[in-house]
Each structure stands twice: as structure tokens, then as C-alpha cells.
Regions:
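A short alpha-helix-loop-beta-strand transition element characteristic
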Residues: 1, 89-91, 145-147
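A broad structural signal for short, well-ordered beta-strand segments within beta-sheet-rich domains
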Residues: 1, 32-34, 38, 43, ...
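A Rossmann-like FAD-binding core segment of flavoenzymes
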Residues: 1-81, 177-210
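Short, glycine/charged-enriched secondary-structure capping and boundary segments
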Residues: 16-18, 85-87, 125-127
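FAD-site-proximal beta/loop scaffold in flavoenzymes
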Residues: 68-120
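Mid-to-C-terminal Rossmann-like scaffold of FAD/NAD(P)H-dependent oxidoreductases
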Residues: 124, 132, 136-206
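Short, aromatic- and glycine-rich surface loops/edge beta-strands on solvent-exposed regions
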Residues: 181, 194-196, 224-243
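Aromatic sugar-binding surface patches on proteins
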Residues: 212-223
Length: 243
């Protein structure tokens, strides 16, 4: 009868909202939560209420829906017990491993991809990531170990509305001609720009009509982006949302 979302925006894909809710005239109630469940041996009704900016139910806004089923969708967290057990560093934002341009973790020879790395929207992204991780793992096996102390490493820094990036670092000697960087934002945005900085120099400004936490974004970095005008290597790539 209805979908209640605690946040003031949807965490799902727009096309899923259209195909699963709007096409069937199912209302999406943003900033709402379940406050009561009726029934003894089984569910007979559910009461929801609007919440304030702190997520607390607002008295007087309750709506009761007679129903026999309550489905809870509590989000996804990457399963990484195996990763943690072998010493892989995990991101406090995604719950998945922190990886470099090769999708390699801090434990040499251990690679990560798919939903164990970060939750994906589309299987196309998962497939592409898996292909890249497999190719990089094979390359590692054939090439042997690398001396990370001698690597020129560029840090990728999420700023101003960007919650995280994958990868988090780029080893310049392992970078291809281009590098895809995936990220998510922390809230809904309209008519903004995604700005890419090499240290303090603006490289590109990409206009975005809409951005939402439920939809993964990506940018493409080029090898020339990693070199400053004076010929020295860039130390940091910063990705930020600017209004």
C-alpha cells in the first residue's frame, strides 16, 4: 500500500521508483517511519508517522494502513569477515576494502571487487569491476611483487558532499591511460558541478542536473591529469561537489 523512507530522499534508483512504485500507484512517503505494528498472531496493520529533521516521529502525523505484511529494507553492508581476518584495511564509509587503481588492497596480492568492495547499483558495474580485478590479479601473478616504497602514489580525496571514492589511491607506474573513479554523494543535489582538482588546480568541472546517494557516479581521470604544468607529479586528486 505504501513505501515509507526515513530519509528525505530515496536511497534507490530512479528507474526502480518509476517501475516498481509509480507504475503501480504505490506512494513513496519520504521522511516517514513505522511507529506501531498491530496484530497478535500475525500482522493486521501498520502505523507510520512523519519524522522531523532529527528522525523523530512527529505526533499527530500518524497514518494506519490495514495490511498483513510489513517488509523491512535495511540496506546492504559488504560481507568482509574473510578480508578482515587476513588484515585487509576496511573503509569506515563503505564497509569494504580500501583499494588502489588495480583494486588491490593493502595486503599485497589480495584484490577486491563487486559488492564486497562497495554496494553497486547495476550489474554492469560489477561485471566491469570483476573483469578489471581479474586482469590485475593475473598481471600481479605474472609480474611478481612490487616495491611500494618506491612508488609515486596519488591520493584521491573525497570532499564537500562526496562520501567516498573507489579507488582511494593511484600508483602512477600502474595507471593505464585512463582511470575510472566511482563515488557517491551524501545527499540530493540539483544543478551542481562535480569539480576535479589536481592538488589546488582545477582540472575539470562537470555539470550535473541531479545527484542522489542512491545512484553511483563516476569520473574518468587521464594520465596527463597526474602531471602538473612544471612537470612534477600530482600528490592529490580532489573530487568535490560545488553549487
Amino acid at each position: 500500500q505504501a513505501v515509507a523512507e526515513l530519509m528525505p530522499y530515496s536511497g534507490g534508483l530512479k528507474r526502480n521508483i518509476v517501475q516498481c512504485l509509480q507504475d503501480y500507484d504505490i506512494p513513496l512517503l519520504l521522511s516517514h517511519t513505522v511507529v506501531d505494528i498491530q496484530g497478535k498472531d500475525r500482522v493486521e496493520g501498520v502505523t507510520i508517522a512523519k519524522v522531523d529533521t532529527k528522525g523523530k516521529p512527529i505526533p499527530g502525523t500518524e497514518i494506519t494502513y490495514p495490511c498483513d505484511t510489513l517488509l523491512l529494507s535495511c540496506g546492504l553492508i559488504p560481507e568482509n569477515e574473510l578480508s578482515a581476518g587476513c588484515g585487509v584495511e576496511l573503509s569506515t564509509v563503505t564497509g569494504g576494502p580500501v583499494v588502489n587503481e588495480s583494486l588491490e588492497t593493502n595486503v599485497e596480492g589480495v584484490f577486491a571487487c563487486g559488492n564486497v568492495l562497495h554496494v553497486h547499483d547495476l550489474v554492469d558495474y560489477v561485471s566491469g569491476e570483476a573483469k578489471e580485478a581479474g586482469a590485475r590479479a593475473a598481471q600481479y601473478i605474472k609480474g611478481g611483487k612490487t616495491d611500494s616504497l618506491k612508488e609515486n602514489i596519488v591520493q584521491i580525496i573525497p570532499e564537500n558532499g562526496v562520501r567516498y571514492t573507489v579507488p582511494s589511491t593511484i600508483r602512477l607506474s600502474h595507471m593505464k591511460n585512463t582511470q575510472t573513479v566511482r563515488f557517491r554523494v551524501g545527499r540530493e543535489y540539483r544543478n551542481v558541478k562535480v569539480c576535479i582538482y589536481a592538488d589546488d588546480q582545477l582540472l575539470r568541472s562537470l555539470p550535473k542536473k541531479t545527484m542522489a546517494p542512491g545512484e553511483m557516479e563516476n569520473i574518468i581521470l587521464m594520465d596527463k591529469d597526474m602531471v602538473k604544468k612544471d612537470g612534477t607529479d600530482v600528490a592529490r586528486i580532489r573530487i568535490a561537489v560545488e553549487e
